[in-house]
Structures are given as C-alpha cells and as structure tokens.
Amino acid sequence: MTSTTPEIEALAADIGEQIAIDVAKWNLFLAEAHLHIPLAERVYPLLEKDELGRAGVEAALKDLSVAIGGGKVNISLLDALSSTMVNRLLTLLEEYQSKNF
C-alpha cells in the first residue's frame, strides 16, 4: 500500500501505543520506532479478508525489517518482539477486528 487510510492509521495508532520492542530492558514502542504504520499496512489485509491468525501475523512481522546500528544489522520485527508482545499484538488485532468488521 502506498497511502494509509484512516482505518489503517487508527490501527497503527493502537499498535504504536501498545506494542514495544524490548531493548536492554527498555521498551521502545513501535510508534517511536516508526514501525507502527508499516506493520498496520501489512496486517490490515488479514483483518479485511477475515484471515487473522498467528501464522499470518508472524509472517507479517518476519517480513518487516528493523535496522539496528545505523543499518549495520537488520533483524525481523518478529525477532525483535518478545513472545508476550506477539501475543499482545494478536489480542489487539482480534479486538480491533471484532469492533470494526
């Protein structure tokens, strides 16, 4: 997707405020890392098509690269999130889907 819709922006805001990368026992929320909109753009089609599930969400997280050290190292967002955060993301998406679709 090249442009964000109000629906994706609303989902991105929820993701950005609630989902964080754990960096040396410090929470870097996805909004602060500027990863909330790209993630929302990847998972929103799953919600639209009623295909939300762990495998699809993990595939979206794995597809999103996080640059570390000025781009010297790249890891997937799936690897950067704790299992707790992945579960929280799934719950957030399920709740969003039940309210909006």
Curated annotation (Swiss-Prot):
Keywords: Membrane, Thylakoid
Membrane topology, as annotated: Peripheral membrane protein
Compartment(s) of residence: Cellular thylakoid membrane
Record bears the keyword Hydrolase: no
One GO location term (cellular component): plasma membrane-derived thylakoid membrane
Pfam families documented for this protein: DUF3181
Main location per the UniProt record: membrane
Protein name: Thylakoid-associated protein slr0729
Organism: Synechocystis sp. (strain ATCC 27184 / PCC 6803 / Kazusa)
